[in-house]
Curated annotation (Swiss-Prot):
Its EC number is 5.1.1.1. Disulfide bonds: none annotated. Substrate binds at R129, M303. GO terms for molecular function: alanine racemase activity; pyridoxal phosphate binding. CDD domains: PLPDE_III_AR_proteobact (cd06827). It comes from Shigella sonnei. This is Alanine racemase, biosynthetic. Pfam families: Ala_racemase_C, Ala_racemase_N. The lineage of its organism: Bacteria, Pseudomonadati, Pseudomonadota, Gammaproteobacteria, Enterobacterales. Monomer but homodimer in the presence of the substrate.
């Protein structure tokens, strides 16, 4: 009997990379594999995508794991380096790094490195999180062009704040700031992540940085799913029924007795709970698939178990397969029901969930 298991479909992952190339045919791809590849497994994901032009991570430790695992493609530190003492490692491993503040720039100017570092200057075009403000950007850029530890030319990167809101006007403003600054500068340019790839073709430039859409999940909050853009779900969260019980009308289920059956029915108990990373906030009615058909969760999600209403005529039995999200049940639907973003759902699964890779 299978307990909580994440099944990762390598074929779907490769399909999605190819689909994104179709959407941004003139751009190179930074496959973003931060946060354990959005819960899909850092090394296995990178090894599944040998055709990616580069990989993007948030931490130096992630980049080093890629190198130790045999990944030789360029690796971009999306948030840059956090300690000047990391610069010799970044140089020796030929990592690319974002540079977004005075402290990082000063560290580059003062370092003694065997080889220069490939730098992506981060311009704050409107996210107001990381990046050099436009009024300070020319002077910052000039110092990078004069720094002996920076491989020339300097590349330029930014990030959209509201790419998933095509009518708000913010993305057009960010693009205008980005284009104005980049004009006449020789480096590579990148501003589009998942939302930019899907909705803003004028933002694709030299490199795009697909994150969640690479894994077949829509970045948009408009009830769209990855399949709407030709992508396939890569992750399926699965488990099994561990019991099937006769349940009488009027009887409550689970902690607090929050759900009471209006009819005689059969309940299934699934080996899955918030101890596995399934959202405790999932209300009664949240769908799961049992033997390929949708049934609702009933009662509270517990640490190790959830209950589902199989229906009075159900023939399901202990050991039968359950899909919590994935093939046939998009994680975006679970996000909508639970009010927990799909980003969080797929990245917060716990260490006791087994990982299985299939082709």
């Amino acid at each position: 009997m299978q307990a909580a298991t994440v099944v990762i479909n390598r074929r779907a992952l490769r399909h999605n990379l190819q689909r994104l190339r179709e959407l941004a045919p003139a751009s190179k791809m930074v496959a973003v594999v931060k946060a354990n590849a959005y819960g899909h497994g850092l090394l296995e994901t990178a090894r599944t995508l040998p055709d990616a032009d580069a990989f993007g991570v948030a931490r130096l430790e992630e980049a080093l794991r890629l190198r130790a695992g045999g990944i030789t493609k360029p690796v971009l530190l999306l948030e840059g380096f956090f300690d000047a003492r990391d610069l010799p490692t970044i140089s020796a491993q030929h990592f690319h790094t974002a540079v977004h503040n005075e402290e990082q720039l000063a560290a580059l100017e003062e370092a003694s490195l065997d080889e220069p570092v490939t730098v992506w200057m981060k311009l704050d075009t409107g996210m107001h999180r990381l990046g050099v403000r436009p009024e300070q950007a020319e002077a910052f850029y000039h110092r990078l062009t004069q720094c002996k530890n920076v491989r020339q030319p300097v590349n330029i990167v930014s990030h959209f704040a509201r790419a998933d809101e095509p009518k708000c006007g913010a993305t057009e403003k960010q693009l205008a700031i980005f284009n104005t600054f980049c004009e006449g500068k020789p480096g590579q340019r990148s501003i589009a992540a998942s939302g930019g790839i899907l909705l803003w073709p004028q933002s694709h430039f030299d490199w795009v940085r697909p994150g969640i859409i690479l894994y077949g999940v829509s970045p948009l909050e408009d009830r769209s799913i990855g399949a709407d853009f030709g992508c396939q779900p890569v992750m399926s969260l699965t488990s099994s029924l561990i019991a099937v019980r006769e349940h009488k009308a009027g009887e409550p289920v689970g902690y607090g007795g929050t759900w009471v059956s209006e009819r005689d029915t059969r309940l299934g108990v699934v080996a899955m709970g918030y101890g596995d990373g399934y959202p405790r906030a999932a209300p009664s009615g949240t769908p799961v698939l049992v033997n390929g058909r949708e049934v609702p969760i009933v009662g509270r999600v517990a640490m190790d178990m959830i209950c589902v209403d199989l229906g009075p005529q159900a023939q399901d039995k202990a050991g039968d397969p359950v899909i919590l999200w994935g093939e046939g049940l998009p994680v975006e639907r679970i996000a909508e029901m639970t009010k927990v973003s799909a980003y969080e759902l797929i990245t917060r699964l716990t260490s006791r969930v087994a990982m299985k890779y299939v082709d």
